[in-house]
Design a protein with these regions (language model features):
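Residue-level signature for tetratricopeptide repeat
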Residues: 26-27, 55-57, 93
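Helix-turn-helix repeat elements of alpha-solenoid scaffolds
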Residues: 26-34
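Terminal, low-structured helical/coil segments at or just beyond the last alpha-helical repeat
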Residues: 82-99
Length: 99
């Protein structure tokens, strides 16, 4: 799936089938459903989920907690626009998980 198609899927009521937890959480974040997104990543152990988890805490303004999750994801804390970060995470995760 391309990042553009992933973003267009936000017009639907459910995420595309078969998304890994990090992408499903990012999808719900794109729908402004922070709680659903957070539930999908809060108990996952991988770096991809940690990256989305960091993004979610950045969205809520909890930069200390976001910093913890960026470190767990082995990523530098984002500084710019939240939408730009959402797009960058989506593009990276989609590329890494392409068939």
């Amino acid at each position: 799936m391309t990042p553009a198609k992933f973003e267009r899927s936000l017009s639907k009521s459910k995420p595309p089938a078969g998304l890994m937890p990090a992408l499903a959480a990012l999808w719900w974040a794109g729908k402004d459903d922070w709680d659903k997104a957070h539930k999908l990543v809060m108990d996952e152990g991988g770096a991809d989920c940690a990256w989305v988890h960091a993004y979610l805490h950045r969205v809520e303004g909890d930069l200390d907690n976001a910093g913890y999750w960026y470190r767990r994801a082995r990523r530098k804390p984002a500084q710019g626009d939240l939408q730009a970060e959402w797009t960058a995470i989506a593009a990276t995760l989609l590329a890494a998980n392409a068939p």
